[in-house]
Amino acid sequence: FGISMKKFSLVFISLLSLLVSPHDGWKATKLSETIAHTPSVLPDRVVLTWNDNTATTQSVSWRTDTSVMSGYAQIGVANASGRSMQTNEFKAVTTLFRSDINDAHYHNVTFTDLEPNTIYAYRVGDGENWTEYYHFKTASLEPQPFSFIYFGDAQNEVKTHWSRVFREAFRDAPR
């Protein structure tokens, strides 16, 4: 043949690039609204809020599909090592939510008898399927300066614009 390996490699890579080059007709598959917002056995839409005294209580809600009949939340004082911790388990109040897209179960728990000014770790699930551990800090019994970020309901362009608002707010929020 008399062709060098260097020339062969150059020709081969050039021809290969023709096979993998993008074309104008390619479009990403758009996921339907029904599929995109379908609940599953995995908890999602986890929302932490206060219900009473922020030094000693905290409430959490989350969504699952309707096959999950009972929800639970586990909570414990967060430790520095991140290793196992002693947790208390709370049974959720489960409510059926009907919408034009799909039905879901919403689960709600209020953690009580918490220690003031303490960092807690919590997770939610059905006893088999759990979220990761999330953290919050209870308020102090004495008035102290604090900051918070308030978000309204964006409704539209959540991925393209609203996610940037979240990142910017967390970056600029004083601690």
Predicted features by range, described:
Residues F1-S4:
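Short, Lys/Arg-enriched N-terminal segments with co-localized hydrophobic residues
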Residues K7, S21-D24, Y106:
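A composition-driven signal for long, intrinsically disordered, charge-rich low-complexity tracts
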Residues S14-S21:
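Hydrophobic h-region of N-terminal signal peptides that target proteins for export
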Residues K6-I13:
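Sec-dependent signal peptide recognition
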Residues W26-R175:
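Divalent metal-dependent phosphoesterase catalytic cores across multiple superfamilies
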